Amino acid sequence: MEEQKSGRKTRVGRVLSNKMDKTVVVVVERLIHHPQYHKFIRRQNKFKAHDAQNACRVGDRVIIEESRPISKDKRWVVVQVLDKAVI
């Protein structure tokens, strides 16, 4: 079967915190090119994402997907855990 495209934004990031119940903080890093100095600069954003099974641990690489607002700050859902953190 073919998968349906959801049309929602997805991001790949690293779990920074899992101290809240069913919520993780995911940091997404990207490189931007500075127009004047022609250097690549690392920028990052933090997103709170819903983790229904509390499966994510700090350091895991995850895929998050945009969703309806779940709380005041939570608008993303953890779709898949790509890599488990090496402890």
Swiss-Prot record:
CDD domains: Ribosomal_uS17 (cd00364)
Keywords for the protein's UniProt record, in alphabetical order: Ribonucleoprotein, Ribosomal protein, RNA-binding, rRNA-binding
Presence of keyword Cell membrane: no
InterPro entries, sorted: NA-bd_OB-fold (IPR012340), Ribosomal_uS17 (IPR000266), Ribosomal_uS17_bact/chlr (IPR019984), Ribosomal_uS17_CS (IPR019979)
GO biological process: translation
Record GO terms (molecular function): rRNA binding; structural constituent of ribosome
Pfam family, one: Ribosomal_S17
GO cellular component, one term: cytosolic small ribosomal subunit
Family assignment from sequence similarity: Belongs to the universal ribosomal protein uS17 family.
Complex formation: Part of the 30S ribosomal subunit.
NCBIfam families linked: PRK05610.1 (NF004123), uS17_bact (TIGR03635)
HAMAP family, sorted: Ribosomal_uS17_B
Known function: One of the primary rRNA binding proteins, it binds specifically to the 5'-end of 16S ribosomal RNA.
Protein name: Small ribosomal subunit protein uS17
